[in-house]
Curated annotation (Swiss-Prot):
NCBIfam families: efflux_EmrB, PRK10504.1. This is Putative multidrug resistance protein MdtD. It comes from Escherichia fergusonii (strain ATCC 35469 / DSM 13698 / CCUG 18766 / IAM 14443 / JCM 21226 / LMG 7866 / NBRC 102419 / NCTC 12128 / CDC 0568-73). It comes from the Bacteria. Residues 33-48, 98-101, 159-164, 218-224, 284-285, 363-395, 452-471 are cytoplasmic. PANTHER family: BLR6921 PROTEIN, MAJOR FACILITATOR SUPERFAMILY MULTIDRUG TRANSPORTER MFSC. The chain crosses the membrane at residues 12-32, 49-69, 77-97, 102-124, 138-158, 165-185, 197-217, 225-245, 263-283, 286-306, 342-362, 396-416, 431-451. GO terms for cellular component: plasma membrane. Keywords: Cell inner membrane, Cell membrane, Membrane, Transmembrane, Transmembrane helix, Transport. Belongs to the major facilitator superfamily. TCR/Tet family.
Length: 471
C-alpha cells in the first residue's frame, strides 16, 4: 500500500478509526454492567438490555446501510454514522435511568450499523482491486485490537473512575473522525434501485418485537397477554415478509438464496450457534464480578486470553477445515464449546482461578474456529449474483442471533434467580451454576444442524475457492 496516494492512505485511517470505535464498544460495556446496575439502582438481571438495545438496532439497520451509502454518498453516510455514534455515546454517559440508557444505546446502534459496512464500501471505491485485500487487512486490524483492549479498559475505567467514561472516551475520537471525514473523504455515489421499504419495515418489526417478547416479564415487565401479542405481531410480520419476497426481484433478501443447501444449513447453524456464543461475552464478566467477587478490572483482564485465543486461531482455521471438512469441524467445535463452557463453570466454582485464563484461551480458539467455518460454509456456494445479498443477510442474522443470545442469558438468570442477585447472596453461585448448565445445553444443540452438512472433507475451502474463481 506504500504506492497509494497520501489522500487515500488518510481515508483508510479514517475508516480504521471507525472500525476501532465500533469494535471497542462491543466489548467495553460488558465489564461495566454490574457497576451500571448499582449506579442506576437496577437489578443486574435487567442490564442485558444495555447490550440487546445496541446489537438489535445494528441488526435492524444493517440492510439499509449499503443502499443509503450508494444513494446519499459514502462520505455523507460515514459522517452521519460517526456523529450518531458519538452523540449516542454522550447521551449514554448522561443517562440517569436505565430507559434513558437504552434509548441512547439504540442511537449508538444506528451509527454502528452504518459505520462498518459503509467503511468496507468506501475501501472498495478508493483502492484499486489488486490492493483491496491489503487495504481491508489494514483497516480491520484496529477492529481486532478493540475487543482485546475493551474488557480491560472498561474494567479499568469503572474501577478507577466511573462507568460513564466508557462512553465519554468515544467523544474526542468521534469529533476528530467526523472532521477528518468531511475534509478528506470523497463522496462517492452510485445509481441505486428502489429501496424495498416494505420488506425492510416488515423485517424490522418482526425482529424487534420477537426479541422483546422473548425478554418477557423478567426484563420488560410485560403481562403474559402483552407478550403473546408481541409474539403474534412478530410472527405475522415475518410471514408477511416471506409472502412479500416470493417472486419479488426487488425484495430486500431474495428467497432464491435458500435454494443453495449450504447457505440454508450455514445460515440456520449460524443463527442457532451465535445464540449460544452470544451469551458468553455477556455472562462471563457478570459471573466473575457478581458470582465470584472479582473487581471490574480483574474481570476485564480475565477476558483477554479469550480474545488472544480467537485471534491466534484465525491463522490456521483454513488448514483445519481443509484437513477435516466442514461437517466434522463444525460438529466438533460446537460440542467442544459446550464442554469448555462446562469446564469454565466447574473450575470457577471450585476456586481454581489460576486455571481460568487457560480455559478462556481454549474457549476463544474453539469459538473462532466455529465462527470462521460457519461464515465460509454459508457463503461459499452462492452464485455471484446472490453473493452480496447473502453476505448482507448473514451479517444481519449474526447481529440478531447475538442479541437473542444475550436476551436468553438474562432470561435464564431471571428464571433461576431472585430479583436482586448480589455477591453477598448465598444462592448466587447456585443461580449461576444452573444458568451455565442451561447455556452449555443451548450451545450444543446446533450440532444437530451441522451434522446435516454434506461430508466435504475432499471438497474443502481451497478447492471451493478455485472452482469459483474459474467460473
Amino acid at each position: 500500500m506504500t504506492d497509494l496516494p497520501d489522500s487515500t492512505r488518510w481515508q483508510l485511517w479514517i475508516v480504521a478509526f471507525g472500525f476501532f470505535m465500533q469494535s471497542l464498544d462491543t466489548t467495553i460495556v460488558n465489564t461495566a454492567l454490574p457497576s451500571m446496575a448499582q449506579s442506576l439502582g437496577e437489578s443486574p438481571l435487567h442490564m442485558h438490555m444495555v447490550i440487546v438495545s445496541y446489537v438489535l438496532t445494528v441488526a435492524v439497520m444493517l440492510p439499509a446501510s449499503g443502499w443509503l451509502a450508494d444513494k446519499v454518498g459514502v462520505r455523507n453516510i460515514f459522517f452521519t454514522a460517526i456523529v450518531l455514534f458519538t452523540l449516542g455515546s454522550l447521551f449514554c454517559a448522561l443517562s440517569a435511568t436505565l430507559n434513558e440508557l437504552l434509548l441512547a444505546r439504540a442511537l449508538q446502534g444506528v451509527g454502528g450499523a452504518m459505520m462498518v459496512p459503509v467503511g468496507r464500501l468506501t475501501v472498495m471505491k478508493i483502492v484499486p482491486r489488486e490492493q483491496y485485500m491489503a487495504a481491508m487487512t489494514f483497516v480491520t486490524l484496529p477492529g481486532q485490537v478493540g475487543p482485546l483492549l475493551g474488557p480491560a479498559l472498561g474494567g479499568l475505567l469503572v474501577e478507577y473512575a466511573s462507568w460513564h467514561w466508557i462512553f465519554l472516551i468515544n467523544i474526542p475520537v468521534g469529533i476528530i473522525g467526523a472532521i477528518a471525514t468531511l475534509m478528506l473523504m470523497p463522496n462517492y455515489t452510485m445509481q441505486t434501485r428502489r429501496f424495498d421499504l416494505s420488506g425492510f419495515l416488515l423485517l424490522a418489526v418482526g425482529m424487534a418485537v420477537l426479541t422483546l417478547a422473548l425478554d418477557g416479564s423478567k426484563g420488560t415487565g410485560l403481562s403474559p397477554l402483552a407478550i403473546a401479542g408481541l409474539a403474534a405481531i412478530g410472527v405475522v410480520a415475518l410471514v408477511l415478509y416471506l409472502l412479500h419476497a416470493r417472486n419479488n426481484n426487488r425484495a430486500l433478501f431474495s428467497l432464491k438464496l435458500f435454494r443453495t443447501r449450504t447457505f440454508s444449513l450455514g445460515l440456520a447453524g449460524s443463527f442457532a450457534g451465535r445464540i449460544g456464543s452470544g451469551m458468553l461475552p455477556f455472562m462471563t464478566p457478570v459471573f466473575l464480578q457478581i458470582g465470584l467477587g472479582f473487581s471490574p478490572f480483574h474481570a476485564g483482564l480475565m477476558m483477554i486470553p479469550m480474545v488472544l485465543g480467537s485471534m491466534g486461531m484465525k491463522r490456521i482455521v483454513v488448514q483445519v477445515v481443509n484437513r477435516f471438512g466442514y461437517r466434522r469441524v463444525l460438529v466438533a467445535t460446537t460440542l467442544g464449546l459446550s464442554l469448555v463452557t462446562l469446564l469454565f463453570m466447574t473450575t470457577a466454582l471450585l476456586g481454581w482461578y489460576y486455571v481460568l485464563p487457560f480455559v478462556l484461551f481454549l474457549q476463544g480458539m474453539v469459538n473462532s474456529t466455529r465462527f470462521s467455518s460457519m461464515n465460509t460454509l454459508t457463503l461459499k456456494d452462492l452464485p455471484d449474483n446472490l453473493a452480496s445479498s447473502g453476505n448482507s443477510l448473514l451479517s444481519m442474522i449474526m447481529q440478531l442471533s447475538m442479541s437473542i443470545g444475550v436476551t436468553i442469558a438474562g432470561l435464564l438468570l431471571g428464571l433461576f434467580g431472585s430479583q436482586h442477585v448480589s455477591v453477598d447472596s448465598s444462592t448466587t453461585q447456585t443461580v449461576f451454576m444452573y444458568t451455565w448448565l442451561s447455556m452449555a445445553l443451548i450451545i450444543a444443540l446446533p450440532a444437530f444442524i451441522f451434522a446435516r452438512v454434506p461430508n466435504d472433507t475432499h471438497q474443502n475451502v481451497a478447492i471451493s475457492r478455485r472452482k469459483r474463481s474459474a467460473q
